[in-house]
From Swiss-Prot:
InterPro entries: F-box-assoc_dom_typ1 (IPR006527), F-box-assoc_interact_dom (IPR017451), F-box-like_dom_sf (IPR036047), F-box_dom (IPR001810), Gal_Oxase/kelch_b-propeller (IPR011043), SCF_F-box_component (IPR050796). SUPFAM superfamilies: F-box domain (SSF81383), Galactose oxidase, central domain (SSF50965). This is F-box protein At3g08750. It comes from Arabidopsis thaliana (Mouse-ear cress). Gene3D superfamilies: 1.20.1280.50. Residues 6-53 form the F-box domain. It comes from the Eukaryota. PROSITE patterns: FBOX.
Length: 369
């Protein structure tokens, strides 16, 4: 039956077939690969995989601690199939997303680096050229002047003195050559440790950094292999950097005294001049504290086009003289909390806090080289 259905493909215009497939989630397309050889060849074609990623890019939230994934639109909670290797090396200290690939740092004695595609369930371990430290900063992207699929990793050595020009301060790993190289690049900023996971947008890495008394956005371009200061940014106790609409940066802010939330947005990152402007704020009294204590995990979030926020964060409650950590998924708009879903709870002393509560990624068919 599968083969007879496959023979019907030529009866439809090829362009129409592709347009239909572009609207199907990556998780479902994987099952289509076994239908017949024609489907397999199409779905595994490089051109198709990247077109699908650019046409259909719904976000997912993932928590490796609970092994849970939530679709922020349907609010369906499902199991995340965490590789066995990650379970042995848990906890994952941080993750950075690029084209459906997650660059993961593991907080164990060897501080391993790995690249993981949650949809394809592929994982690749990256052996550092020197010992990886938890104070190092990592990012993932690509040289868009050469080939999008030749992904690269930047490792900025956090403990090297910035005024010592004799020592390299960063390294680049290239997937296709499976090798590291030293890069001597000028770097005059201090990356904020609370936001050190950074954001990869269209192959370039962005971080919140501090220079003297000012907070700013810095960018690393994998094409030119240079750092650049992009724009100043607002900053408060809870400051989380994210991507909006595929080509802009977002900031989620919440102060220490006030529970009010501010959302800031840049214009397109391809513009000559980039700056932040306030998108909207929320001042209703029912807002949760997105980051209760410095020792607890930072929230993971995304911003919707209807001036709404989806955020997965930790809370704390006391019941009968016992303290519990409550994991809750919220949807918030300008009028306050619209929905909240409790997804997990733990005894305070049984819970080993991850550095970030959750991560946002886009499912993709892109294989790991």
């Amino acid at each position: 039956m599968a083969s007879s259905k496959c023979l019907l493909l030529p009866s439809l215009p090829f362009e129409l077939i592709e347009e239909i497939l572009y609207k199907i989630p990556a998780e479902s397309l994987i099952r289509f690969k076994s239908t017949c050889k024609k489907w397999y060849n199409l779905i595994t074609e490089k051109r198709f995989m990247y077109n699908h990623l650019d046409h259909y890019s719904p976000e997912r939230f993932i928590r490796t601690y609970d092994q849970q994934i939530i679709d922020p639109v349907t609010e369906i909670l499902s199991d995340a199939l965490i590789p066995d290797e990650f379970r042995d090396l848990y906890p994952i200290y941080s993750m950075v997303h690029c084209d459906g690939l997650m660059l993961c740092t593991c907080r164990k004695w060897d501080n391993s680096l790995a690249v993981w595609n949650p949809v394809l369930r592929e994982i690749k371990w990256i052996k550092p050229s020197v010992c990886y430290l938890h104070t190092d900063y990592v990012g993932i992207g690509y040289d868009d002047n050469v080939s999008r699929d030749n992904y690269k990793i930047l490792k900025l050595l956090g403990r090297l003195p910035k005024d010592d020009d004799s020592d390299p301060n960063c390294e680049i790993y290239e997937f296709k050559s499976d090798s590291w190289k030293t890069l001597v690049a000028k770097f005059d900023w201090d990356i904020d440790i609370r936001c050190n996971n950074g954001v990869s947008v269209k192959g370039k890495m962005y971080w919140i950094a501090k220079k003297k008394e000012d907070f700013t956005i810095i960018r690393f371009d994998f094409s030119t292999e240079t750092f650049k200061e992009i724009c100043v940014c607002p900053y408060t106790l809870v400051t989380r950097l994210g991507c909006f609409d595929g080509d802009r940066l977002s900031l989620l802010l919440q102060g220490e005294e006030s529970q009010g939330i501010e959302v800031w947005m840049t214009n397109k990152l391809s513009d000559k001049v980039v700056s932040f402007s306030q998108y909207f704020n929320v001042t209703t009294p029912d807002l949760p504290a997105l980051h209760l204590q410095s020792c607890m995990a930072c929230p993971g979030y995304s911003i919707g086009k209807r001036r709404n926020i989806r955020v997965w964060c930790e809370g704390s409650v006391d019941v009968d003289d016992k303290s519990y950590v409550i994991i809750t998924f919220y949807e918030i708009d300008e009028g306050g909390v619209i929905k909240q879903i409790e997804t997990a709870s733990y005894g305070q002393f049984e819970y080993d806090d991850p550095f970030i509560c959750c991560y946002v990624y886009v499912p993709s068919l892109i294989p790991i080289q």
